[in-house]
Amino acid sequence: MSANFVKEEYAREPLRLASMCLANNIPFEIGELYGGLIVCYPTATEDRVSDAVCHDGSYGRHEGLLEMMGLVDEEAVGDSVEGFLTAEQVFERWHKHWLETHGVEGE
């Protein structure tokens, strides 16, 4: 039997992001990935718009920061992912997208 363990330093920002989503009724799913956590907005299915990770291979992991895929300005960033983001920075984009696509918060 094997167990997956999330490194404590990789959990802080994903859990803060999940807390912000909960407080604002923004749907998300959270799970373990490569020794860290992944937060998917709004789901982890093919309907996923964006996700944020902090794990063994993510940009920003040494500082405990998030790497985001989706809702990234690929032209400005030069990549399909953007790293070294705080939970607040990711949440700001998710919240804006949620309001733009659903009209009101949490509905």
Task: Name each region found by the language model.
Residues 2-12, 16, 67-107:
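Mixed-charge, Lys/Arg-enriched low-complexity segments
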